[in-house]
Swiss-Prot record:
It comes from Homo sapiens (Human). This is ATPase family AAA domain-containing protein 3A. Belongs to the AAA ATPase family. Changing residue 297 to S: Loss of S100B-binding. It holds the Pfam family AAA.
Length: 586
């Protein structure tokens, strides 16, 4: 029994205390007489560490228990302790069994997982094997196709070679046949020629006699015809001369015929010039508001609207600086009053950078004054060569036939109105310039001359003498650019976005602030460049997927326009000085 030796005792056991500590080691047990033998440790006995104290204490406790009155209780307590230990051992055994069962379930789960992995791996291997077999089958099929294609190509090549050989044999046969036929033909022709020559040699006398008879007969026939014709003409002329009435009638008829032909020719020329001057348009005129018969027949509604339209404001749609606007308004008022009073028109020179509104103001000036306008370019004169003088006279003749008065606008006038003394110009262009100077030597109440140029310093001195007023159109400032941006933004973006069924839409942002910002960024740009910028906004919106013009799109197009303007200024600067009134790089 374990409780006799003090082992596995419960915490509440009575009569048994904790085991006594081990006795201390005797100091003489380690040393003694053996220490002097070379300091080697002495061999230990197997019972040297045995402590008999526990046995003694157990025997003592057993004796006390036998004489104690609690011996039975102690025995019961020992049995209960043994039962408790057995229950604990059974619970541990159950735990061990549960652990074993859990381990078995884990093993089963691991085996199932391993089986699943094995199945998936087998499936994957099977799929890979199937794919590999399919790949091999495809390769075999492709190889078969290639072999079949090579075989077909080889058969086709053999067939082509066979056809070529047959064609060569047929060609050789035909050539041989033609050669033999040619030889036979030559032999036949040679035989016929020999036979004909032999027959002609034998019949030479007969042939010469036939030729002689035919020539004599032809000579006799010709002589008789001449005698007969001379007799007839002589008798007719004698009869005509002797009859003075016939002579007089013939002379009068020929005279009337000559007069009619000459009159018809000149009348046709005069009528053609009249029709061309009244109804046609000169070749030098590129654009005109003057109504022609052909235009009235083609567009009757537009012509009627133009006839019924009232005079417009000369500066409508034209954005200029305040000082320039006041000056050109005075010119427009003076021109309108000149037309009303049927006085002489003044000639005007408008110079400045391109795209500043010179052509637009000329059109507005004509419409405001109730006049017709005609636009020609100086570059069209030089290619006409010798026809330039005639075309120039036709232009001014056509201008003098206008009942409402004509504003003749010459764009890029420096192209042909150059200095005659220093510039190297052709004789034809010099003659055309002289014709222009002749027709503009005096003021007219039929037409008004307006010249536009970027380089007015190249004009001939006689041209400068014919100009009454010079107007300088400069690049727009900050305020003018903002007005231009707002006007073109409204024309090309706002109106298409709010009117009609167009695809253009406009995103939500501050339009006024954006127009002011664009005007600030476009410093140095002309009105035409700002109009092109607005058109590019419209095109960008049309090119987008949803047709919406956003603020970012506008900024992108503005940056592109500014870069393009700077590039143009770099090119202009590279050309060197002497460009007249070209815009300076900003």
């Amino acid at each position: 029994m374990s409780w006799l030796f003090g082992i596995n005792k419960g915490p509440k056991g009575e009569g048994a205390g904790p085991p006594p500590p081990l006795p201390p080691a005797q100091p003489g047990a380690e040393g003694g007489g053996d220490r002097g033998l070379g300091d080697r440790p002495a061999p230990k006995d197997k019972w040297s560490n045995f402590d008999p104290t526990g046995l003694e204490r157990a025997a003592k406790a057993a004796r006390e228990l036998e004489h104690s009155r609690y011996a039975k209780d102690a025995l019961n307590l020992a049995q209960m302790q043994e039962q408790t230990l057995q229950l604990e051992q059974q619970s541990k055994l159950k735990e061990y069994e549960a652990a074993v069962e859990q381990l078995k379930s884990e093993q089963i789960r691991a085996q199932a997982e391993e089986r699943r992995k094995t199945l998936s791996e087998e499936t994957r291997q099977h799929q890979a094997r199937a794919q590999y077999q399919d790949k091999l089958a495809r390769q075999r099929y492709e190889d078969q196709l290639k072999q079949q294609q090579l075989l077909n190509e080889e058969n086709l090549r053999k067939q082509e070679e066979s056809v070529q050989k047959q064609e060569a044999m047929r060609r050789a046969t035909v050539e041989r046949e033609m050669e033999l036929r040619h030889k036979n033909e030559m032999l036949r022709v040679e035989a016929e020629a020999r036979a004909r020559a032999k027959a002609e040699r034998e019949n030479a006398d007969i042939i010469r006699e036939q030729i002689r008879l035919k020539a004599a007969e032809h000579r006799q026939t010709v002589l008789e015809s001449i005698r007969t014709a001379g007799t007839l003409f002589g008798e007719g002329f004698r009869a005509f001369v002797t009859d003075w009435d016939k002579v007089t009638a013939t002379v009068a008829g020929l005279t009337l015929l000559a007069v009619g032909v000459y009159s018809a020719k000149n009348a046709t020329l005069v009528a053609g010039r009249f029709i061309e001057a009244r109804l046609g348009k000169p070749s030098l005129v590129r654009e005109t508001s003057r109504i022609t018969v052909l235009e009235a027949l083609r567009h009757p509604i537009q012509v009627s609207r133009r006839l019924l339209s009232r005079p417009q404001d000369a500066l409508e749609g034209v954005v200029l600086s305040p000082s320039l606007e006041a000056r050109v308004r005075d010119i427009a008022i003076a021109t309108r009053n000149t037309k009303k009073n049927r006085s002489l028109y003044r000639n005007i020179l408008m110079y400045g950078p391109p795209g500043t509104g010179k052509t637009l103001f000329a059109k507005k000036l004509a419409l405001h004054s109730g006049m017709d306008y005609a636009i020609m370019t100086g570059g069209d004169v030089a290619p006409m060569g010798r026809e330039g003088v005639t075309a120039m006279h036709k232009l001014f003749d056509w201008a003098n036939t206008s009942r409402r008065g004509l504003l003749l606008f010459v764009d890029e006038a420096d192209a042909f109105l150059r200095k005659r003394a220093t510039e190297k110009i052709s004789e034809d262009l010099r003659a055309t310039l002289n014709a222009f100077l002749y027709r503009t030597g005096q003021h007219s109440n039929k037409f008004m001359l307006v010249l536009a140029s970027n380089q007015p310093e190249q004009f001939d001195w006689a041209i400068n003498d014919r100009i009454n007023e010079m107007v300088h159109f400069d690049l727009p400032g900050q305020e003018e650019r903002e007005r231009l941006v707002r006007m073109y933004f409204d024309k090309y973006v706002l109106k298409p976005a709010t009117e009609g069924k167009q695809r253009l839409k406009l995103a939500q942002f501050d339009y006024g602030r954006k127009c002011s910002e664009v005007a600030r960024l476009t410093e140095g740009m002309s009105g035409r460049e700002i109009a092109q910028l607005a058109v590019s906004w419209q095109a960008t919106a049309y090119a987008s997927e949803d047709g919406v013009l956003t603020e970012a799109m506008m900024d992108t197009r503005v940056q592109d326009a500014v870069q393009q303007h700077q590039q143009k200024m770099c090119w202009l600067k590279a050309e060197g000085p002497g460009r007249g009134d070209e815009p300076s790089p900003s």
